Amino acid sequence: MAEITAQLVKQLRDKTGAGMMDCKKALQETGGEMEKAIDWLRQKGLASAGKKAGRLTAEGLVDSYIHTGGRIGVLVEVNCETDFVARNEAFRSLVQDIAKQIAACPNVEYVSIDEIPPATVEREKAIAMGSDALKGKPENVKEKIVQGKMDKTLRELCLLDQPFIRDQSITVEELIKQAIAQLGENVKVRRFVRFVMGEGIEKEEANLAEEVAAQIAAKEAPPAVVEAPVAETPEPAVAETPEAKPAATESKPAKSKSAKKKK
């Protein structure tokens, strides 16, 4: 097996236009033989993808995918160079596959590793450095272990590094490169958003044991005695005494004239 040097990888890249990592993998798969490596890249559809990678992609398609049950939804924008390709059924099928891929990857947050904010990288590094498994190890060993963990963790966040759901032998990035070779245009995933029903809403978790105990206690508790309100006896009404009127003076009957004459 020929030694796979940086110079050999560069030669293969110049001949095929494929990416550096693809060229290195092709040489590894073919024992370092240049012609076989070229054929390997052509079979994977990667031989001409690198030459188109820098072209402007101003056309494309925004597509959606709603997973069965309506609990997960995806919106994705994939760009290409011309409106003609944007209407192509192969391109539309690619965009739909990418949308389904995003729905199937709950950890994916970015398109590529270049989009990960430095603050996120530093946070992940701090977490890796604080691992108990690294205690007592030399610093140079720690750095290698942390770097390996970092690469794995960060790639899990990136769409292009995920194994394709329909063919685990290739990544999403390789799938796109195959599409570039097939369509003859540069293709790029620009952005996406993944929705999960109820995400971000805090739901109170009921403790079943406590709930059952509360129900039993409520049934066993004696009924509460409620005192009937005492009706207030109304005070008897006091009748008002009418004011006494002065007694009328009795007048003596007047004597008749006939009585006076008899005397």
Curated annotation (Swiss-Prot):
Main location: cytoplasm
Keyword Oxidoreductase: no
PROSITE patterns: EF_TS_1 (PS01126), EF_TS_2 (PS01127)
A GO cellular component entry from the record: cytoplasm
Superkingdom classification of source: Bacteria
Bias (Low complexity) ranges: 221-251
Name of the molecule in the record: Elongation factor Ts
